[in-house]
């Protein structure tokens, strides 16, 4: 076999692998997996022992094509009977209108301590032209905030709330998108979210981009006990089999999924 023929076949195989992986990721977007992680903290108040959190992220509703399958995913979340549900951004790909068909699905999410959310880089509408159908970029963002509220989700915008259980209190912080990568928006304000939270013995942070943790949270806010992020799903492109896990996003982000 000649060198040129070999390289042609090699290129074809590589392209086929890439396309196959993308197709697999797209076709399996409703193949939900629940990953269970147990954490232990000495400073978590006794009243919160056994606290169960369901963490979801990167819904990207504009990519959905099967409402019934989406509803099944919500059912799986509800079946977990969590104390608290946290969503860490990217509700849409670009526009709030993507959520119109799915609001009556996601508004079913509920938990005793509430459903809280933050914004991700896609939620700001930075990747499409505006105005669109007479709607400006600013109006789109405001309508997206309203969608969170209408679904019963408390959107945290550089602020914190206090969670109370059995007379004990912990702080839940949520910030807007903050990335250590220059190409992504940096609207998050940890100083605002953390202000007044010092007195609580345990703090959970919701921040869409995990690069925020190494760059700012770990060095400047060491009293944050748990940070939950999304973002690094790499367009669902990757391979995960027993004993092996790979995605191109791992070469960009230290923390990835």
Task: Please tell me what each predicted stretch does.
Residues 2, 27-30, 204-209:
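Short N-terminal helix-initiation segments at or just after the protein's N-terminus
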Residues 2-14:
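N-terminal secretory signal peptides and thylakoid transit peptides that target proteins
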Residues 2-3, 35, 151:
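Generic detector of short, well-ordered, non-transmembrane alpha-helical segments enriched
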Residues 12-26:
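Single-pass alpha-helical transmembrane signal-anchor segments
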Residues 23-36:
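Aromatic-capped interface at the extracytoplasmic side
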Residues 44-257:
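Soluble catalytic domains of enzymes that build or remodel membrane lipids, polysaccharides, and related
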